[in-house]
């Protein structure tokens, strides 16, 4: 009887808390920013079933129609107060994408000089566009690969595109991209998948799908940048936040953030459905990894090379190891982690966890993958080392790098990994003598002043958007193109390090005191 009474009151408490949360969410949405045409106009994308029956020409035709519809329904219908230079949808704006030599919001194909030696499919991240992997595309083209940079459904157009998309649409688009890659460069020429953030989850899931459906073309190598294997914060509950939006007065409740759109190749605003679909994708991915691991069917996975910051606000770094790498076979896989900058004297301001994150992630028992970290040579030196633990070993080997950790940068970020420091748009050190290639040097803005004066959160200016170690990253990706890695031959098997399962970790992380705001996008 006492147990029933406790359960009854517990259930009542949950219902009351849920109603209170929805009431607060509804009230806040009434006072939020007014939704603009780019928040309300939803372009017509091909859905999963249509994508599975389409070819590249069909996808390109639909993409062209989508961009024409955005111009007609958004850019050409702007109210006078939206016709400002900082609005990417204003045709006279310096950040209007269609005015550039190439609109990197669109899918593209790069052909190498001479006969192709392989093909690579590039999969960008959530709220992102094919722009983010264009420097990786250049490397692959120089190495003789046909490069397919694919725009995922709901991306590159208007943020409202993410209000109606499903993760199954992204997976179907990935399959379409692989089909086109193999049409242009048939097997046995190598096929690589490169994924950034949400694109990393898509690349990984595609490779798992191949195990269960041998008719799908197999990738020979995966390169992942900050892959979305597990999501931090409240993403798993994001759908609840959007419930008030079923009533028109609370339409803005369908959005986790509504921000001016000044970034030509990435959305600033983020709808609830974007977080919801990313969570559904990672949940399906983790479940599939668990299922295939239990049946010992992961042995045919291709080598996976991952680059990740130990500090990441968007994805769970521990989940990459516990949910993925500790399940991988001995196949030449490697993870590269970028440590915090220990010479920056921010210790009183940085969370204590930042200084111990790398030690907690390092293997405690021999593993079948290579564990590499980029660290300061010492705590008072900007010089850096590559510290690598080989598969089946625990002893690390150091290699000095010629890339110092820049003063003033205390860590890398989720966004920064695949972007060089001299990138014209996002780079911290672009060529300031040349006119901006894409309207502004967003990554080089170093603004200080009074709070409340800017139209955006200071995160937009202080969050690092380029990687000081990009030359190293490019070198390592190139190594895998020229000299592909493979098994050690030592029959190394994964040994799970002590810790809680990734799904339980995700649930518990929701109640951490500093975890007090919803997942607001990458």
PLM features per residue range, with description:
Residues 2-92, 384-522:
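N-terminal targeting or regulatory segments adjacent to alpha/beta-hydrolase or S9 domains
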Residues 21, 109-113, 266-453, 467-489:
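Serine-hydrolase catalytic core
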Residues 98-156, 486:
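Short, surface-exposed "cap/lid" segments of acyl-processing enzymes
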Residues 122, 153-168, 240-244:
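Cap/lid segment of the alpha/beta-hydrolase catalytic domain
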Residues 158-190:
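Catalytic nucleophile-loop/oxyanion-hole region of alpha/beta-hydrolase
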Residues 193-195, 225, 307:
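Short beta-strand immediately N-terminal to the catalytic nucleophile in serine-hydrolase-like folds
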Residues 194-199, 203:
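Gly/Ala-rich beta-loop-alpha elbow adjacent to hydrolase catalytic centers
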Residues 222-234, 340:
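Active-site nucleophile loop of the alpha/beta-hydrolase fold
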């Amino acid at each position: 009887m006492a147990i029933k009474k406790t359960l009854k009151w517990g259930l009542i408490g949950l219902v009351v808390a849920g109603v209170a949360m929805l009431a607060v969410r509804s009230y806040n949405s009434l006072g939020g920013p007014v939704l603009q045409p780019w928040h309300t106009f939803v372009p017509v994308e091909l859905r999963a079933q249509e994508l599975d029956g389409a070819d590249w020409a069909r996808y390109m035709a639909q993409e062209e129609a989508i961009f024409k519809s955005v111009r007609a329904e958004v850019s050409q219908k702007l109210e006078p107060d939206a016709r400002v230079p900082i609005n990417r949808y204003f045709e006279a704006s310096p950040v209007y994408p269609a005015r550039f030599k190439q609109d990197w919001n669109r899918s593209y194909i790069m052909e190498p000089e001479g006969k192709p030696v392989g093909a690579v499919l590039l999969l960008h991240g959530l709220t992102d566009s094919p722009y983010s992997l264009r420097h990786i595309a250049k490397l692959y083209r120089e190495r003789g690969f046909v490069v397919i940079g694919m725009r995922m459904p709901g991306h590159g157009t208007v943020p409202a595109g993410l209000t109606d998309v499903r993760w199954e649409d992204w997976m179907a688009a990935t399959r379409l991209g692989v089909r086109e890659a193999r049409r242009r460069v048939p097997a046995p020429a190598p096929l690589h998948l490169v994924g950034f953030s949400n694109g990393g989850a898509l690349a990984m899931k595609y490779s798992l799908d191949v195990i269960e459906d041998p008719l799908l073309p197999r990738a020979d190598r995966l390169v992942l940048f900050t892959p979305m294997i597990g999501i931090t914060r409240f993403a798993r509950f994001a759908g609840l936040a959007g419930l008030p939006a079923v009533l028109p007065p609370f339409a803005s409740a369908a959005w986790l953030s509504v921000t001016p759109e000044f970034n030509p190749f990435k959305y600033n605003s983020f709808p609830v459905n974007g977080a919801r679909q990313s969570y559904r994708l990672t949940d399906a991915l983790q479940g599939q990894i668990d299922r295939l691991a239990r049946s010992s069917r992961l042995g045919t996975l291709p080598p996976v090379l991952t680059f990740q910051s130990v500090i990441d606000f968007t994805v769970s770094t521990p989940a990459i190891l516990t949910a993925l790498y500790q399940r991988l076979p001995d196949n030449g896989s490697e993870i590269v982690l970028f440590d915090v900058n220990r010479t920056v004297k921010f210790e009183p301001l940085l969370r204590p966890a930042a200084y111990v994150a790398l030690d907690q992630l390092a293997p405690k028992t021999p593993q079948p993958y290579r564990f590499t970290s980029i660290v300061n040579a010492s705590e008072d030196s900007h010089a850096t080392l590559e510290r690598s633990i080989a598969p089946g070993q625990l002893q690390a080997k150091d290699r000095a790098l010629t890339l110092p950790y820049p003063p003033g940068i205390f860590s890398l970020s989720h966004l920064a990994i695949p972007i060089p420091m001299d990138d014209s748009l996002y780079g911290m050190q672009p060529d300031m003598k040349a006119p901006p290639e894409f309207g502004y040097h967003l990554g080089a803005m170093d603004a200080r002043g009074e709070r409340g004066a800017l139209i955006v959160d200071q995160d937009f200016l202080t969050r690092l958007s380029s990687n000081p170690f990009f030359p190293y990253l490019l070198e390592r990706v190139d190594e895998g193109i020229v000299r592909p890695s493979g098994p050690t031959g030592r029959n190394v098997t994964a040994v799970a390090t002590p810790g809680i399962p990734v799904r339980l970790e995700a649930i518990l992380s929701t109640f951490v005191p500093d975890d007090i705001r919803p997942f607001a996008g990458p």
